[in-house]
UniProtKB/Swiss-Prot annotation:
Entries under Pfam families matching the protein: UreE_C
Encoding gene, per UniProt annotation: ureE
Biological source species: Prochlorococcus marinus (strain AS9601)
Family: Belongs to the UreE family.
GO MF: nickel cation binding; unfolded protein binding
High-level lineage: Bacteria, Bacillati, Cyanobacteriota, Cyanophyceae, Synechococcales
Localization in the cell: Cytoplasm
Name by which UniProt lists this protein: Urease accessory protein UreE
Amino acid sequence: MRMNKQIVVTDWIKEKPKLGLFLKLTLSSDERRILRGKRLTDCDQEIILQLPRNGKLNDGDILSTNESNFYVEIIAKTEDLIEISSNSKIELIKTAYHLGNRHVEVEIEEGILLTKSDYVIKNMLLNFKVNVKNTKKKFFPERGAHSHE
């Protein structure tokens, strides 16, 4: 459903309303950091984000709009990633160190590291004592120590 009226997204809602129309907005990990500006929902409805600057959009977030019965649901986009694993915890820690030294975003899961697909990084990883494979998943990188999110 497309509306001709401009929809402005203004804030987060703690609980999903039982009634109302929901627009889905699928965003990459990078796009989920940007809290202001025009976006197209999954059904090509243009919306304007005007959210408070002190946050980050997360998978499943529900956002309120200037239209009382319209809401926006954030969906994390599936992204091309590199999955890194090893039988050796120390090798995985060394790899995390090298990725951090290059300011590469990393998601840390039990026994694996995930980072965005990048041929330079992948070639570097092939020189380490770790297993490297391509995968497609939703990406939730660790927030850095100097993050303002």
